[in-house]
Amino acid sequence: KKNMTVVVDKNKIITIETGFSKAGNADRVIDLKTKTVMPGWIDMHVHLEFETSPKRQIEGFTYNPADYAYQSVQFSEVTLLAGFTTVRDLAGSGVNISLRNAINKGWIKGPRVYTAGKAISTTGGHIDPTNGYRKDLMGDPGPLDGVANGADECRQAVRQRYKDGSDLIKITATG
C-alpha cells in the first residue's frame, strides 16, 4: 500500500496507519515515501562465527576463540544489514552464546539470535572435531567438545549446553 505511516516504539511496530500522520515534537521521522518497507527476514540455519571459504579448515588450527568472537561481530552486523532480523545459529565454538548476549545487551549490532552453542554429535559424526585428521592428531573429544556416545554422555552434553545458555539443542547423529 502507498501513503502509509508506520509507528515504531523501542524497535517494535506499534501501529500502521493510513495516510501520513503528523509527528509530535519528540518523535523522530524517517521519510520512506520512495522506499518499500517490509518485515525483517528470518534465517533458520546460520553459523555467525565463520563463513565458508577455502581457508576454513586451516582456520581451525590458526584461530583462537577471540578471533572467532571478533569475526562474529562483523558477520552479525552484515547479516542484519542484509535484512535478517532473526537468525537461528546452529553450532559454533560456543562464542555464539556470548555473541547473542552482546547483541541483546546492545553492545554490538546484529539480528535477534537463537543459538545452539556447540552442536552434539557421535564419534565420527558431522561435528566430531577429529574427522579427517591423522590418528596421532585426533585426541579424545568428549561431551564438552560436542562428541557424545550413549545415553549418559548425551544427557551430559545436553545439560552442559543448557548450563552454557543455549536456546536450543542441535544433534548431528550422522556424518
Language-model-detected regions and their locations in the chain:
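Active-site-proximal beta-strand/loop segments in catalytic clefts of secreted hydrolases
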Residues: 17, 32, 82, 90-91, ...
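Metal-associated gating/positioning segment near the N- to mid-region
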Residues: 35-105, 123-127
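Short, structurally constrained coil/turn elements
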Residues: 23, 104-109
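A generic local structural motif
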Residues: 17-18, 29, 73-77, 100-101, ...
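Histidine-rich, glycine-flanked metal-binding segment
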Residues: 1-38
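Short, solvent-exposed loop/helix junctions and linker helices
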Residues: 1-2, 69, 148
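Divalent metal-coordination and catalytic microenvironments
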Residues: 6, 11, 34, 42-45, ...
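Metal-coordinating catalytic core of metallo-dependent amide/deamination hydrolases
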Residues: 107-175
